[in-house]
């Protein structure tokens, strides 16, 4: 009997983990963690049962690098797993940074540096559209998911049963990726579709509309002599925003400089290694070639925080930038304003108290985070001082939120179901309301597998 067991993200977004198994074989798709708002004082949560299952797992596959899909992988080695990890080449490079950062933040809550290094040594990188053997009778293939660099949908062929796991997918055209395109990728129908449903209830504006609104707001901030602060996720959204801005502003960035801070700088370096047709859109490569750039991050209007002063640490450099009179754009972490340099810019260096300045939110904000509070209208906020204490910040700058998303719309999710022609569908990675809306829109109740159940017998 072939079973599909959802160990994480059954009816929420976070700690994604799925086990596919029969009597003799067990394969894990993703092993992420659930982060909690900093004020809760909670450590991150792992997938259910995975520690106990680890010694009996045969193979692990990772769809992409985001920590809600990958960050528990090193912990598997702590609990007895000894096999390989299959992922794309960019994902392998990115998780090295993200896993080490998580170890720095939470310590050895889930794994040690030894487990992390063991996981990296056992990571096997793959390209898209190339089938590879996992076990006797089981093969896998990665398809471009258009979510972030290296993100993949995973096709498993399990003794002839075809299982398609979307991971996180995007149907919007972004600078680095074309919309996910399924109909020419799979030559046979799918038996089981395991699909994310993140945006099944949320209408999304076009990228063109959203970027136009952002650039207009940045120009307004410039015209009043303010500093524009964009808190952003280090991976994916930040690279997208940088590329949009060099395309929209180009030489105007000579006078309205874009400064990059935080882990974004490390991720930029990895993106720079994979600027080929194999991993990014032809549109981006054409743009770079036409303008004489090897990378979007080579644009003369983009500046690294370390460039500011010849000596001194980053705090000194940030203070110098914050005290400059001319308008600038500061793109920095963290995206949900839960830590990182954004705290210093808003609080310590007092940019949050100047009405000329702007705080422009470009990412999803989890309930309970500082970013969610600000997006909801709260202007008296508490920030961590880095030494276990809190201090009050009164925000008087302009605050605007922009609807960027790295996940497929409801229409995109339904297109995937249409083109894969699955016999059964398991909706996951979405709130209950999103999953219910997806099921209703699909209008095929006989195909649905409840997320808390296992798949019935399959021939």
Region spans (language model):
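Generic long, charged, amphipathic alpha-helical segments
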Residues: 383-416
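A general structural motif
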Residues: 205-210, 301-316, 335-338, 380-383, ...
């Amino acid at each position: 009997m072939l079973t599909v067991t959802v160990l994480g993200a059954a009816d929420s977004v976070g700690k994604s983990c799925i086990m596919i198994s029969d009597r003799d074989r067990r394969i894990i798709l993703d092993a992420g963690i659930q982060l909690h708002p900093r004020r809760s004082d909670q450590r991150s949560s792992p997938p259910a049962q995975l520690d106990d299952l680890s010694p009996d797992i045969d193979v692990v596959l990772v769809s992409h690098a985001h920590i809600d899909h990958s960050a528990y992988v090193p912990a598997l080695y702590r609990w007895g797993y000894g096999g390989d990890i299959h992922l794309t080449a960019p994902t392998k490079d990115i998780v090295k940074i993200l896993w080490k950062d998580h170890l720095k933040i939470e310590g050895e809550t889930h794994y040690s540096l030894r487990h992390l290094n063991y996981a990296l040594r056992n990571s096997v990188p793959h390209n898209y559209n190339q089938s590879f053997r996992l076990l006797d009778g089981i093969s896998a293939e990665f398809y471009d998911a258009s979510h972030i660099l290296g993100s993949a949908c995973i096709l498993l062929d399990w003794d002839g049963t075809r299982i398609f796991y979307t991971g996180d997918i995007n149907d919007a055209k972004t600078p680095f990726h074309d919309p996910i395109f399924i109909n020419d990728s799979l030559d046979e129908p799918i038996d089981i579709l395991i699909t994310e449903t993140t945006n099944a209830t949320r209408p999304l504006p076009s990228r063109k509309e959203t970027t136009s609104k952002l650039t207009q707001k940045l120009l307004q901030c410039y015209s009043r002599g303010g500093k524009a602060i964009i808190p952003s996720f280090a991976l994916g959204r930040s690279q997208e925003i940088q590329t949009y801005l060099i395309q929209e502003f180009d030489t105007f960035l000579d006078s309205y400089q874009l400064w990059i801070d935080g882990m974004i700088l490390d991720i930029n370096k990895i993106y720079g290694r994979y600027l080929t047709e194999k991993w990014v859109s032809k549109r981006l490569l054409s743009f770079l070639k036409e303008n004489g750039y090897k990378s979007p991050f080579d644009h003369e209007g983009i500046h690294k925080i370390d460039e500011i002063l010849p000596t001194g640490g980053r705090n000194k450099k940030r203070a110098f930038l914050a005290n400059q009179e001319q308008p600038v754009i500061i793109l920095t972490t963290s995206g949900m304003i839960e830590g990182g340099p954004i705290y210093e810019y808003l609080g310590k260096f007092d940019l949050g108290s100047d009405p000329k300045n702007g705080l422009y939110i470009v990412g999803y904000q989890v309930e309970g985070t500082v970013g969610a509070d600000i997006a909801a209208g709260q202007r008296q906020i508490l920030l961590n001082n880095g030494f276990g204490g809190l201090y009050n910040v009164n925000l008087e700058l302009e605050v605007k939120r922009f609807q960027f998303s790295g996940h497929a719309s409801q229409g995109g999710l339904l297109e995937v179901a249409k083109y894969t022609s699955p016999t059964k569908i398991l909706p996951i990675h979405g709130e209950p309301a999103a999953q219910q809306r997806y099921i209703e829109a699909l209008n095929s109740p006989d195909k649905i597998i409840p997320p808390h159940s296992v798949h019935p017998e399959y021939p």
